[in-house]
Amino acid sequence: MLRTLLAIACLTPLAAAALPAAALAQAADPALSTVEELDAGLLRTMRAGGTAQARSKVIAPVLERTFDLGLMTRLAVGPEWVKQSPADQQALVDAFKRMTIAQYARNFDSFGGESFEVSPRVETRGGDKVVRTTLKIPKDAPVAIAYRLRQSGGSWKIIDVFYKNAISQIATRRSDFGTVLQKGGAKALVARMNAIAAKGD
C-alpha cells in the first residue's frame, strides 16, 4: 500500500505556505516534462516493490534529474547556509540527497492502482514555474501536489513541493533544520538527515 505522502515533508509539525495567484503559461511548457518524468519514476518505483534499498535504485536517478537537490538544500538550510564551510555545505547536500531518496523509496513502497494527472496549465512566479498534479488513489481521496521549478543548466528542475497546494516541503524543513543547526551546527544536521534516511519506517 502507498504510504502517506505527507510523511515525506513532515520532519516537524506542518508549516503552511500558500501558493499565490500567478499567470497561466501555455500548456506546452517544458516544465511539464520534468514533472511527468518524476511521476513516471514514482509509478515505476511503486511497481518495483521489493526492499527500500531496491526501490532507492529505481527512484534515485529520477530524483537526481528532476530535482535541484543542491538548491533545495540551500533553501532548506536558509540564512545559515552562507556561514557553513565549503566542506560542510557539501556534506549537507550529500545528506539531503540521501534523505530525499530514502524517503521517496520508503513512502512509494508498492503499487495499488495509483495514477497521476498533471494539469496542462503552468503558472509563472517570477522566474519560477508551478506545475500542479493530482495523485489518484483507488478507494481514497485524491492528493493535490504542486511543484515549483526553476531553470538550471538549460532544464527545469523542482525546487519545492507543495502538498495539498499549501504545505511547503522546504518551509517545513527550514523550521526543523534551523533548530538543529543552532544547537549543534552542520555536523548535527548531517547526522539528523542521515538518521532520517536510515529509518526503517
Language-model-derived ranges and their functions:
Residues 7-18:
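Bacterial N-terminal signal peptides
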Residues 142-172:
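Short beta-strand edge/turn micro-motifs at domain boundaries
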Residues 19-26:
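Sec/Tat signal peptide C-region and signal peptidase I cleavage site
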Residues 161-201:
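Low-complexity, intrinsically disordered terminal/linker segments enriched in charged
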Residues 101-143, 191-201:
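Surface-exposed, charged secondary-structure patches
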Residues 81, 98-99, 123-124, 137, ...:
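Solvent-exposed loop/turn segments at secondary-structure junctions
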Residues 27-104:
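Early exported N-terminus immediately downstream of N-terminal targeting peptides
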